């Protein structure tokens, strides 16, 4: 394994006597454009691609072979010299056709469309204030690359100006522009030139719309990292003011072109003004429903419920958090295509059934037709119901040419084995190598006991007995022996769901149980499904009911067993979507993004480390609040908890979420799936050796940890440097006290008091945003696209639930196949969820992957670059390791006849639904 070592004490700096070089002396990105002599090794030139939203441009980046650490001040007194000529080349991304080119009107003809001002890193020695900026207007120049527009400006920088530390940009056009980068080139008149690259990758608003949220001037700092205390004197106020602009003042409604980051509670999921049934409780800021915070929009309160926010218009996110044009186009095309596929059986269902959402599939043959033959698309006029399913798409459906035959892609697991969903072995295997590998846990005591109040919910002790389990284990050992040997495992959805059973059952066309599912680890390393317990708590009108189901050769019990598995799969689907996926990788991450942008300057090394791992997350979360998790949205219409779905995620946040166990090793230990062992690989001994998610995930965790440790060591040599970083401490304080304010006093929050604690905290954030999310997101269509394998909802109770409904029991005995299909999601529910999973599981064409070249750090410090090279190389190695494991027939949980290889932790992928690839961020 590559483990690049960084030496934070290295302070060698490339110097030059020319004034052009000294203009850029504050940057570690000094690049001599002269051809170096064969004996020179102090400057190493490298070409790399700038990180842009969907484009690539090659710029020259040069770094000292023993570069200055950001703590050091590499500036020097500027020798007396004549004014230096500096050329600026600004690259602007063309976003919609040739829109920017067409907008170059009279302002551009007279050369006043883009104002640039050079900012010195030094203060004026006489006044003690910032030096006057050097200003010039940029003019449009021809460029062979039609994806960008290039502007150039010339400056005569006076002697004594000092190193250039930043550039101020004013957009004098009538519309916003996406500024990719600015490259400054200084010449000394003797043929010597130096280059200072400045990363921008940001939307710059027109001067005409400037206000508190969208300032008319934007500052972009040179690609040089500084801890707050080492900021050059001439840049300190700029650094402070830029952060203040991003914080805003907490008032007013945010506009689409703002760049303000602030917090609010989840009070925008309901829509009480539209319909009283769509009112939802506020999540966050109260003891009943604690929750992370979201981005504040400032929309006015609801008329009927002042605590709720109105749901008008597009949900605000800061302008730089929006999708790139490429991402937006891909997302729209993917969504439209998927919804068209879902629309066919859904529209047919609505035409045939006045109950609309509740018509089951008439046969498994019809389900198969979705993938095999396709179905004919009805007219668009029959699809108006989609306005209530996936808002804002109907107009695109009208404009999209449709094929006469539409067909869902066959999910990968069904391609491998059409009947895998029926097998107990596959049910068990997917707890280790499916899309919710975070739910299974070790059985550590027996009998199984609930922590709920028995006076309310019934006896705490489970109905699963030792004798029953031992019978299913064929008496090879006792339960006591199995527990001591760590061979019993379970899915425990009992205490989480039981308090909501009667609430959910009061709703139409859904049901709920508390459930426990027990597995036995066999000698060949696979799991055997032993028993399922389903529980209905007591109510004022009925006593508690519970029953344990086991595999059976009896026809009736065999079908009851299949129905019990369908209920557990629906429980697992809800747990996965609401908790493992939404809560832990989307919702809990948004506060990190808000706090980082409010408290960490863009020249802060930790901001530069984290920024790639926040890409698109806020926009995706905002869209989820609009259509996915909102009242009457797809989750509520299609998953068992329905209107109580988000309440349940709040309960899970209260009872289960803690930052310290979001780290993969700690999560495995918490669930009993591993124990600490310094002699074992990764320092952990797994309870199940062939646990594909854990085995591959730990490789990724260690690679991230090694990279982050190296990066942190470059900037923080000791505990004092961490504790003394005021921006870093403010960031972490705000995460705890504001972003996760309902848990601010929890004792488990780590303290950032050493390089080690900082590296571990950052590794956890990167892991959750990248690898955790990839593990639970990009396999959703492969495992859930064929919904009998993973139904999102169970709609009918078990036929044997007491008091037994005689008519329902007769129908079950007469046609158990139909009874199972009636328990499954309806045609509308199933196909809409299939369409959504297809979108969620897909990589866009502009995806940026963990360790990819597009997200290489902009700080061109040679040691940082070497560490990143090692990180990228290690991830390539891991791909090979995973491929090898998937071909190893001894690993039966990932290799075998009809078994889908486990590839969700493979770092890289092509676009589309691939079942692999780890994007840098919580992205779809």
From Swiss-Prot:
Keyword Metal-binding: yes
Entry-linked PROSITE patterns: LIPOXYGENASE_1 (PS00711), LIPOXYGENASE_2 (PS00081), LIPOXYGENASE_3 (PS51393), PLAT (PS50095)
Induction behaviour: By fungal infection.
Pathway assignment: Lipid metabolism; oxylipin biosynthesis
InterPro entries linked: LipOase, LipOase_C, LipOase_C_sf, LipOase_CS, LipOase_Fe_BS, LipOase_plant, Lipoxy_PLAT/LH2, Lipoxygenase_dom_3
Domain Lipoxygenase per the UniProt entry, residue ranges: 225-924
Gene Ontology CC annotations of this record: chloroplast
GO MF terms held by the record: linoleate 13S-lipoxygenase activity; metal ion binding; oxidoreductase activity, acting on single donors with incorporation of molecular oxygen, incorporation of two atoms of oxygen; phytoene dehydrogenase activity
Root EC class: oxidoreductase
Binding site for Fe cation: 581, 586, 773, 777, 924
SUPFAM superfamilies: Lipase/lipooxygenase domain (PLAT/LH2 domain), Lipoxigenase
Bias kind Basic and acidic residues: ranges: 239-262, 302-315
Listed EC numbers: 1.13.11.12
Residue pairs linked by disulfide bridges in the UniProt entry: none
Cofactor: Fe cation
Organelle targeting peptide span: 1-61
Start and end residues of each PLAT domain: 88-218
Annotated cofactor note: Binds 1 Fe cation per subunit. Iron is tightly bound.
Annotated keywords: Chloroplast, Dioxygenase, Fatty acid biosynthesis, Fatty acid metabolism, Iron, Lipid biosynthesis, Lipid metabolism, Metal-binding, Oxidoreductase, Oxylipin biosynthesis, Plastid, Transit peptide
Catalysed conversion reaction: (9Z,12Z)-octadecadienoate + O2 = (13S)-hydroperoxy-(9Z,11E)-octadecadienoate; (9Z,12Z,15Z)-octadecatrienoate + O2 = (13S)-hydroperoxy-(9Z,11E,15Z)-octadecatrienoate
Region (Disordered): 231-315
Localization annotation: Plastid, Chloroplast
Family: Belongs to the lipoxygenase family.
Functional summary from the UniProt entry: Plant lipoxygenase may be involved in a number of diverse aspects of plant physiology including growth and development, pest resistance, and senescence or responses to wounding.
Protein name: Lipoxygenase 7, chloroplastic
Taxonomic path: Eukaryota, Viridiplantae, Streptophyta, Embryophyta, Tracheophyta
């Amino acid at each position: 394994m590559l483990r690049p070592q960084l030496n934070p004490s290295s302070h060698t700096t490339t110097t030059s006597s020319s004034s052009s070089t000294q203009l850029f002396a504050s940057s570690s990105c000094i690049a001599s454009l002269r051809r170096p002599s064969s004996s020179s090794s102090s400057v190493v030139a490298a070409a790399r691609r700038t990180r842009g939203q969907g484009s690539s441009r090659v710029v020259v980046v040069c770094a000292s072979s023993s570069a200055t650490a950001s703590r050091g001040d590499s500036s020097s007194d500027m020798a007396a010299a004549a004014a230096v000529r500096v050329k600026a080349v600004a690259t602007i991304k063309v976003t919609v056709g040739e829109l920017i080119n067409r907008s170059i009107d009279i302002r551009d003809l007279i050369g006043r469309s883009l104002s640039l001002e050079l900012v010195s890193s030094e203060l004026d020695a006489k006044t003690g204030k910032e030096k006057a900026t050097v200003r010039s207007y940029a003019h449009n120049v021809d460029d062979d690359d039609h994806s960008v527009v290039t502007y150039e400006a010339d400056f005569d920088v006076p002697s004594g100006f000092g190193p250039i530390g930043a550039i101020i940009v004013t957009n004098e056009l009538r519309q916003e522009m996406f500024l990719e980068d600015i490259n400054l080139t200084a010449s000394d008149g003797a043929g010597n030139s130096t280059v200072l690259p400045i990363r921008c990758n940001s939307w710059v608003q027109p001067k005409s719309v400037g206000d508190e949220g969208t300032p008319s001037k934007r500052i972009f700092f040179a690609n040089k990292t500084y801890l707050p205390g080492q900021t050059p004197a001439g840049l300190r106020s700029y650094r402070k003011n830029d952060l203040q602009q991003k914080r805003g003042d907490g008032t007013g409604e945010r506009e689409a072109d703002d760049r303000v980051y602030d917090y609010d509670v989840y009070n925008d999921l309901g829509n009480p003004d539209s319909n009283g049934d769509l009112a939802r409780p506020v999540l966050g800021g109260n003891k009943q429903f604690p929750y992370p915070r979201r981005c504040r929009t400032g929309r006015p309160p609801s008329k009927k419920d002042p605590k709720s926010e109105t749901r008008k218009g597009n949900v605000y996110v800061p302008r730089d958090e929006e999708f790139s044009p490429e991402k937006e186009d891909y997302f729209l095309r993917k969504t439209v295509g998927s919804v068209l596929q879902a629309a066919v059986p859904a529209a047919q269902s609505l035409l045939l059934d006045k109950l609309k959402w509740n018509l089951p599939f008439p046969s498994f043959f019809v389900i198969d037709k979705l993938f095999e033959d396709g179905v004919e698309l009805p007219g668009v006029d029959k699809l108006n119901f989609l306005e209530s399913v996936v808002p804002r798409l109907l107009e695109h459906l009208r404009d999209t040419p449709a094929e006469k035959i539409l067909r869902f892609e066959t999910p990968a697991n069904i391609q491998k084995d059409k009947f895998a969903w029926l097998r107990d072995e596959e049910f068990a295997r997917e707890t280790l190598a499916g899309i919710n590998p975070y739910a299974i846990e070790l059985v550590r005591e027996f009998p199984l006991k609930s922590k709920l109040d028995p006076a309310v919910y019934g006896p705490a002790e489970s109905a699963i007995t030792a004798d029953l389990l031992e019978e299913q284990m064929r008496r090879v050992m006792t339960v006591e022996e199995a527990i001591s040997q760590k061979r019993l495992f379970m899915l425990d959805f009992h205490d989480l769901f039981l308090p909501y059973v009667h609430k959910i059952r009061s709703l139409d066309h859904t049901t709920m149980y508390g459930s426990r599912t027990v597995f036995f680890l066999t000698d060949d390393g696979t799991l055997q499904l032993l028993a399922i317990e389903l529980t209905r708590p007591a109510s004022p009108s009925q006593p508690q009911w519970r029953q344990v189901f086991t595999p059976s050769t009896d026809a009736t019990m065999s079908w009851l067993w299949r129905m019990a598995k369908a209920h557990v799969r629906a429980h697992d689907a809800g747990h996965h979507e609401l908790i493992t996926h939404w809560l832990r990788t989307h919702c809990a991450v948004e506060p990190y993004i808000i706090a980082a942008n409010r408290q960490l300057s863009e020249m802060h090394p930790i901001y530069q480390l984290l920024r790639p791992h926040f890409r698109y997350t806020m926009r995706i979360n905002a869209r989820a609040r609009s259509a996915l998790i909102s009242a009457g949205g797809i989750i509520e219409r299609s998953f068992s908890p329905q209107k109580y779905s988000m309440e349940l995620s709040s309960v899970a946040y209260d009872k289960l979420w803690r930052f310290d166990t979001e780290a993969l090793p700690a999560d495995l230990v918490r669930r009993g799936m591993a124990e600490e062992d310094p002699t074992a690989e990764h320092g952990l001994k797994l309870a199940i050796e062939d646990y594909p998610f854990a085995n591959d995930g730990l490789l990724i965790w260690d690679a991230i940890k090694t990279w982050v440790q190296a990066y942190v060591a470059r900037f923080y040599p000791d505990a004092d440097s961490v504790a003394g970083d005021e921006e870093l401490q403010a960031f972490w304080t705000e995460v705890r006290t504001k972003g996760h304010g309902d848990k601010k006093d929890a004792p488990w929050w780590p303290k950032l008091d050493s390089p080690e604690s900082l590296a571990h905290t950052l590794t956890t954030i990167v892991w959750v945003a990248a690898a955790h999310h990839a593990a639970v997101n990009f396999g959703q269509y492969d495992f859930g696209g064929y919904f009998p394998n993973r139904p999102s909802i169970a709609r009918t109770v078990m036929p044997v639930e007491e008091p037994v409904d005689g008519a329902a029991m007769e129908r079950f005995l007469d046609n158990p196949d139909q009874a199972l299909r009636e328990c499954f999601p309806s045609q509308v529910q199933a196909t809409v969820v299939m369409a959504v999973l297809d979108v969620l599981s897909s990589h866009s064409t502009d995806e940026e992957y963990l360790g990819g070249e597009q997200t290489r750090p902009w700080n061109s410090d040679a040691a940082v670059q070497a560490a990143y090279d090692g990180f990228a190389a290690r991830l390539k190695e891991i791909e090979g390791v995973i491929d090898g494991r998937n071909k190893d027939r001894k690993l039966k949980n990932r290799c075998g006849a009809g078994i889908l290889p486990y590839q969700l932790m493979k770092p890289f992928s092509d676009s589309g639904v691939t079942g692999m690839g780890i994007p840098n961020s919580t992205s779809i």
